[in-house]
């Protein structure tokens, strides 16, 4: 049961967001979704802010095979987005290229940095859906057409429109947001 009045609703351990999605949006309060799992927080971020790119990355002809599951699981387990050298690459491009060429290279570098998050989100979504019990460790051996989720993803994007997505340890999150008028769930 929710309190009668609060200024901010904060899901400390957001997980699948069942409570957030189960409650009606409230214009009177700020909503914060948090999960320590960076893949899950990234998935929610991409569903909220990059919906079209996320759906495009999911693809329209999914394979849903054990081989695809293994490739996706390996991608999620081993590959993190690497933007460590983005600033350095942009500085070098600006220094050595003429302005029109620099702008084109800058656009490509920034798009590639952003797309990594979308690719990771799409891979994680498929890993969840294709795995046994959504555990992300073993193939579920059941047919699943990712296209059946497209409408739900659009609905989730609209529901998350005014929600802050965080990826913090619960203690850091509570320290940051703790106020008398907040409701932590």
Q: Predicted regions span which residues?
A:
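The start of beta-strands in P-loop NTPase/AAA+ ATPase cores
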Residues: 6, 30, 182-184
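Short, motif-level signal for alpha-helix interfacial/capping segments enriched in acidic residues
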Residues: 12-14, 147-148
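Conserved class I S-adenosyl-L-methionine
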Residues: 6-13, 32
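Glycine-rich helix-loop-beta junction characteristic of Rossmann-like nucleotide cofactor-binding loops
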Residues: 1-4, 176-177
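Conserved SAM-binding loop of SAM-dependent methyltransferases across substrates and taxa
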Residues: 16-28
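Class I S-adenosyl-L-methionine-dependent methyltransferase module
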Residues: 26-167, 171
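Active-site segment flanking the S-adenosylmethionine/decSAM binding pocket
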Residues: 164-185
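Short, well-ordered alpha-helical microsegments
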Residues: 17-20, 41, 173-175
